[in-house]
Amino acid sequence: MEMEANDHFNFTGLPPAPAASGLKPSPSSGEGLYTNGSPMNFPQQGKSLNGDVNVNGLSTVSHTTTSGILNSAPHSSSTSHLHHPSVAYDCLWNYSQYPSANPGSNLKDPPLLSQFSGGQYPLNGILGGSRQPSSPSHNTNLRAGSQEFWANGTQSPMGLNFDSQELYDSFPDQNFEVMPNGPPSFFTSPQTSPMLGSSIQTFAPSQEVGSGIHPDEAAEKEMTSVVAENGTGLVGSLELEEEQPELKMCGYNGSVPSVESLHQEVSVLVPDPTVSCLDDPSHLPDQLEDTPILSEDSLEPFNSLAPEPVSGGLYGIDDTELMGAEDKLPLEDSPVISALDCPSLNNATAFSLLADDSQTSTSIFASPTSPPVLGESVLQDNSFDLNNGSDAEQEEMETQSSDFPPSLTQPAPDQSSTIQLHPATSPAVSPTTSPAVSLVVSPAASPEISPEVCPAASTVVSPAVFSVVSPASSAVLPAVSLEVPLTASVTSPKASPVTSPAAAFPTASPANKDVSSFLETTADVEEITGEGLTASGSGDVMRRRIATPEEVRLPLQHGWRREVRIKKGSHRWQGETWYYGPCGKRMKQFPEVIKYLSRNVVHSVRREHFSFSPRMPVGDFFEERDTPEGLQWVQLSAEEIPSRIQAITGKRGRPRNTEKAKTKEVPKVKRGRGRPPKVKITELLNKTDNRPLKKLEAQETLNEEDKAKIAKSKKKMRQKVQRGECQTTIQGQARNKRKQETKSLKQKEAKKKSKAEKEKGKTKQEKLKEKVKREKKEKVKMKEKEEVTKAKPACKADKTLATQRRLEERQRQQMILEEMKKPTEDMCLTDHQPLPDFSRVPGLTLPSGAFSDCLTIVEFLHSFGKVLGFDPAKDVPSLGVLQEGLLCQGDSLGEVQDLLVRLLKAALHDPGFPSYCQSLKILGEKVSEIPLTRDNVSEILRCFLMAYGVEPALCDRLRTQPFQAQPPQQKAAVLAFLVHELNGSTLIINEIDKTLESMSSYRKNKWIVEGRLRRLKTVLAKRTGRSEVEMEGPEECLGRRRSSRIMEETSGMEEEEEEESIAAVPGRRGRRDGEVDATASSIPELERQIEKLSKRQLFFRKKLLHSSQMLRAVSLGQDRYRRRYWVLPYLAGIFVEGTEGNLVPEEVIKKETDSLKVAAHASLNPALFSMKMELAGSNTTASSPARARGRPRKTKPGSMQPRHLKSPVRGQDSEQPQAQLQPEAQLHAPAQPQPQLQLQLQSHKGFLEQEGSPLSLGQSQHDLSQSAFLSWLSQTQSHSSLLSSSVLTPDSSPGKLDPAPSQPPEEPEPDEAESSPDPQALWFNISAQMPCNAAPTPPPAVSEDQPTPSPQQLASSKPMNRPSAANPCSPVQFSSTPLAGLAPKRRAGDPGEMPQSPTGLGQPKRRGRPPSKFFKQMEQRYLTQLTAQPVPPEMCSGWWWIRDPEMLDAMLKALHPRGIREKALHKHLNKHRDFLQEVCLRPSADPIFEPRQLPAFQEGIMSWSPKEKTYETDLAVLQWVEELEQRVIMSDLQIRGWTCPSPDSTREDLAYCEHLSDSQEDITWRGRGREGLAPQRKTTNPLDLAVMRLAALEQNVERRYLREPLWPTHEVVLEKALLSTPNGAPEGTTTEISYEITPRIRVWRQTLERCRSAAQVCLCLGQLERSIAWEKSVNKVTCLVCRKGDNDEFLLLCDGCDRGCHIYCHRPKMEAVPEGDWFCTVCLAQQVEGEFTQKPGFPKRGQKRKSGYSLNFSEGDGRRRRVLLRGRESPAAGPRYSEEGLSPSKRRRLSMRNHHSDLTFCEIILMEMESHDAAWPFLEPVNPRLVSGYRRIIKNPMDFSTMRERLLRGGYTSSEEFAADALLVFDNCQTFNEDDSEVGKAGHIMRRFFESRWEEFYQGKQANL
């Protein structure tokens, strides 16, 4: 008890627990006591080595942490850094914990500590126990597992996390005022800091310690290292990363990150002495009488563990027990602080400080002017939170269960200290060794550290472990003292083997290493450094580095988000800080931030820019508030944030557990709250003076004499310090402490080894005992077996064998049944019911693919035709018209061509050509700007297809053949391609978006209604006591299933996402609505509301269905033949599409199946044989005596039943090993045919098609039993209902399962046929090992007892799939079937025949067991399923049409529930049954569905010839060229003297000749002046003739009659050419000619030369026709009456001028061309005036109109009338050539069209009305855009131009219709216009004129006005 009282750091280690177990460790029985009023505490878990250290009366109680930073907490009491070599930390990590010795016991020193001279070094008289780092994955349970003691010395399992503010709150007696001799403050350099690497290095097994280096030499190489927090030396492992250079060195405080080499000097900047980060500097009192001597604990090394790549901790250390009481050392020697000397490890124990890239550690430096380096933030697992005095650490501990180390304390500006790290003396470094660097802090002007880290040969970074000389207490030093440099030596990498890793890491090497040289060298270094150690100047205490709000806001400027969430805890407000990365990742603690920064290296954002303190007013603040919708996070305003920050500030922490607390001794000296603990000064005494002082302090009570001795010792020590005589004492203490530590390490190592040996011995003994026990048991079993074997007769063995076979049979049967349950390839199933015979589409002639494209086109035009300008009622062709047009039948070809033109126009507009084809031109014009016609659309289509990468073969065909000459399927594919491209146009996309928006609104409203309806039904059910299901109809029950909405929401994944996004809205509104609905007063009112909402729900459902079906067709699935079932939005019925062209050839399937079959069967057989071995061993003792054949077994009923008939519990047990027998390959094997069986199936095809022989009774019985089995497979999973039902299937009907074989098999013996199942079992096992080769190939060698089946057996075992009538019979008697009869035949000739079993399984068994023949059939069925039956050819092609709802019901019944495809099809058909019935009942008006005979179409498809179609097109182009020639001549536009040749289109020697397509000869080729010969043209090819005649025509058109685009006047150039003449000519040999030409003419000629199709020639022809100025022709004549130039054949030319008049426009009407001359009215008027000679009595026009007399033409002179015969102006208007042939003569008599006399008068009246002065408002239709409201008032508009068009095309059948339209014009005018307006007055004038003229023409006739 006395020793325990003296144990100031007593605590017991926790038992080891799994890191991730989540169990809360039980508290230990240790008790922390106080000595001199200051506690010393070391948390058990956590990777930080901070502890509660008594420093100048300041207790630095650190919370548990998992950070990789090794912190020690010695506090200096001087204003300068007084570092004593004997006062330092030995921080050795990565080694497991070892038991500690009792400090009061006289046990031998631990082996680890014994390696150091002097044994152990107690701390404050007590050896401080080392701490065990927590497991990497134990971050969530660190506090619960740590042992910390607070003010009362009570131990608690809860770790205490606090900062300076918390420390202040916890100690009211303490303060942090700065005394003259106060603790030093530390500052760090703002330069870059080396960081820990993330990989592992191996270390040399040994190294020597180099001689110490003078401080002046060491000052040459400097780098930032470790600083102390509150006087604590912070150890950082300086490592350079080799594999990740971006993580090696990081810029600090805005500096550029740099990667330092291994021997590179790192300059360290001196911090600004004028800047201080202290928030509240204070002074410490000068009185030092009661100040305890500075004490420190020696930190024990940890066991090294293998690095874990994904561990969460930094070092990857597992939890082990802390040092126990028995391992603590005596208290004789005074403590010293040794430098942290860590030799490198050897190769055997390479370890990593970083488990992965996120587990990094580095030295952290806090600067008063700049934030810490990135190494602090990026390369730490759990890093610091740099908040000033904040409680962020505890907040985060409470909310996140993760600990962070305390923040750093930064130096005061006036403090001067130097941290120097001297490199090794030898620059040469071995690639596998790392120097042990000793880090010494000296009070120099600036902190300087000179590291030297050696490279490693492997990918591991060696941890350079430094020895940190912590600042000692300077309380006893005078205010004025000399500055003594403090340096340390760095061991050389070429050190001798005496400096072994075992010195510091005893487990690193098994060999014993001598550490004497290491200790001597260290002592020398300490002697050197101790000579000049002084204290200088006093300064303020600097608190730790904090992150300013400006720094915390920096990440927010780079895409980060910071959120502080505040909620009310049990006693106070709690704040939690969350960070969101730029990618949206949420981070709640520093390890996540560091890991993110390490993986995403960002140079501008570092670790110091983050703070998890909720009191930092940066980011968004959210508060948890109770709202009507529940608890929600509400964002706080800027005014609310300060009050919330004050609310979460205050005293925090968990109250003590008073039940487990022990009474503590009240400290003798009380200190105020926040006052730092007093620092002991025993370390400053020499050994002689310190020993009695320690002995006296260790005692419980001190008498007056002892107190006087202590005071004397202290006074003596202070005098020594003042005289500077304590230097040698410090060096001696350091030397002694190292010896003690070395000794203790050796002792602990020896203890551990002995303990491990004992454990190994115990384990070996236990194993030996177990082995002996097993041998004894085996011997006993063997003896029992031998006795049983000797006692039993020989028949016992036969019975055992039979039992084993029966069990094997059951296992095999169970496996087969399990396989039969699985979904299978539909064509592998043999028990299909026949599908209904669907009727094919009646009028379908096109191939299947072409009809599919036609359906796509029609549905697209119906859905989106209005957007593209189509009128669905007129412009959308039906399927019948589309089919006729594709087959070039009748007038439908023109409609298809017009459809192509309109679709291509829309596609050229949007989406248009791709970007790389935008500049494509033909004849100098952009392709998209060329006017499309039926004649040239083929060439534009070819360019469009080429631009979009359509197959080159089609484009090449279009180069020489027009669109209409292509096969029907190609034309349908082209139209479908245009439709698909238009689907991506902006118009279509916008239309789809509108539809989706409307669907979204409908769906939202439907959900709201459904939610309210559901709540009302719930309320009604509660009030009436009925269930909700009773109140819902069948439709509602189905509607509540999610699958019922699929038909409504077939718009795809985007709508499902829409559903998820909107699904929350109705739920929130629903609560409010439900509250309102629930207040309904009575049940009838609820029922009325339910009825009303049900109607609304039905309305929205229909609207949603209508909107969704407009978007796309619905695929219901596939049947067994892979036919697809389609439901189209506008067409009636269900369409079934064959799989033409989609089936894989059977040969390919066979080849692909071979390897799969072998693998599947090979994996099946070992499981079967292993199963047999297991059964043989387990059922030996369960054998029963032999019984006669036919007798029931004398066994228990449970064991007699087969496995599938046992109780559920036993069935489950039996199924577990069976699951092992089903390899994955078997899942896919049924979908592939087996070649051998397929071959035999083909060889016996004729046999399989037979109907079979008459059935026997036994066959029917077997069919019924199998039907029951199949029903069980489909309907239930219970094993007890195998034979309870009898459902007949097509396969189970009589005569379809066991057809008669082609050859009668050998008659088997009755015994063999009925009793033995072994042949069938062997056949099944052999089938799994058969090769997948052809039948003639011999199988590989197998065991002798495994016969192979014959081909005939395989064929005869194949069941048929033909429907027939079922004959149900009673399943009582069973007889042998042909399948069973084949068993002896298979056994015949087998040399290694298995012995016959005395018991048979062929007979019917009692107690419900099925017969073995049934399972034989199951085996055969299982093997049959491995072969997929071929799809019948008639099911592969074509389209079917389902119109009858009854056919749909029959389809549902016939689908197989086990087929992969038919199962899904059945699901969809049943789900959408009502909707599909509505679709089937739609009216169908398409002619293709009308049954009719189409022999002509069939013949057209069979005799389709593209050459004939192309020849017809080429001939039409030739005729068009000839017409253009005639038109030019008739217009006198040709060069004088040129006449067109005779027509070639009437020649009989014309023949089609196809030109080979050449890409260089393409008309889109842009080459100019292309040289080379033109393509050879043949005079018998219509296309070549058209090209030659067109070229000649262009050259002979007068240039002055040409215009743009071929003849721009500003581009005309004059070219000259020399023509050579014959030599014999008297003139010169050459003749120079000049001609005009334009570049467009040259391009036109080149393009014409390269034309190879009619469409290309039409393009050239059309451009030439547009370039001729027809209006400049002298013969350009228009009718004087109608002012039109059409109908040239009826245009009568005046003999006096070039005017003319149509013979039907002349008044009175002319029946024929008059003889003699004819003069127009203008000429007659001029004759009256004397310009022309006129006969007397010739009336004028005006007189004629009034009198109504006819004109009399004179025939006095010989001039003849002219009739202008002109061709059509455009290719699409009028006939291209005359029926009687064209003549160049000017006059030709033409037969007059037979006009009705009344309609002729109508034409005259209309002509006169159009020429009237008041007719201007009625000449053209009224534009509704210009005249608003016209269409709303005038329902039937009419005008004179519309009347003329109708009159010319024969739209009027009588004059009454004409008069009605004329009066309609005037009535509309009177209705819309006022009478006094101009238009109204004109209408009245025209009405009077029309009525007067009508009376003149119809005098004596009743006019129907």
Curated annotation (Swiss-Prot):
Pfam families: Bromodomain, DDT, MBD, PHD, WHIM1, WSD. It comes from the Eukaryota. Belongs to the WAL family. PROSITE patterns: BROMODOMAIN_1, BROMODOMAIN_2, DDT, MBD, ZF_PHD_2. Keywords: Acetylation, Bromodomain, Chromatin regulator, Coiled coil, DNA-binding, Isopeptide bond, Metal-binding, Nucleus, Phosphoprotein, Repeat, Repressor, RNA-binding, Transcription, Transcription regulation, Ubl conjugation, Zinc, Zinc-finger. The keyword Chloroplast does not apply. The modification Phosphothreonine is found at T507, T548. Residues 1-59, 362-434, 648-792, 1178-1220, 1283-1318, 1330-1412, 1734-1755, 1769-1789 are annotated as: Disordered. The modification N6-acetyllysine is found at K680, K799. Residues 1283-1293 have a biased composition (Low complexity). This is Bromodomain adjacent to zinc finger domain protein 2A. The lineage of its organism: Eukaryota, Metazoa, Chordata, Craniata, Vertebrata. Residues 35-59, 379-391, 399-420, 725-734, 1345-1359 have a biased composition (Polar residues). Component of the NoRC-1 ISWI chromatin remodeling complex at least composed of SMARCA1 and BAZ2A/TIP5, which regulates the spacing of histone octamers on the DNA template to facilitate access to DNA. Within the NoRC-1 ISWI chromatin remodeling complex interacts with SMARCA1; the interaction is direct. Component of the NoRC-5 ISWI chromatin remodeling complex (also called the NoRC nucleolar-remodeling complex), at least composed of SMARCA5/SNF2H and BAZ2A/TIP5, which regulates the spacing of histone octamers on the DNA template to facilitate access to DNA. One of its GO terms (biological process) is DNA methylation-dependent constitutive heterochromatin formation. Residues 1793-1897 form the Bromo domain. A zinc finger (PHD-type) spans 1676-1726. It is found in: Nucleus, Nucleolus. Residues 693-792 form a coiled coil. The modification Phosphoserine is found at S509, S613, S1051, S1184, S1397, S1559, S1747, S1770, S1783, S1785. GO terms for cellular component: chromatin silencing complex; cytosol; NoRC complex; nuclear speck; nucleolus; nucleus; rDNA heterochromatin. Residues 546-617 form the MBD domain. Residues 1306-1315 have a biased composition (Acidic residues). Residues 848-913 form the DDT domain. One of its GO terms (molecular function) is RNA binding. Acetylation at Lys-680 by KAT8/MOF promotes its dissociation from pRNA, affecting heterochromatin formation, nucleosome positioning and rDNA silencing. Deacetylation by SIRT1 in late S phase enhances pRNA-binding, allowing de novo DNA methylation and heterochromatin formation. Acetylation is high during S phase and declines to background levels in late S phase when the silent copies of rRNA genes are replicated.
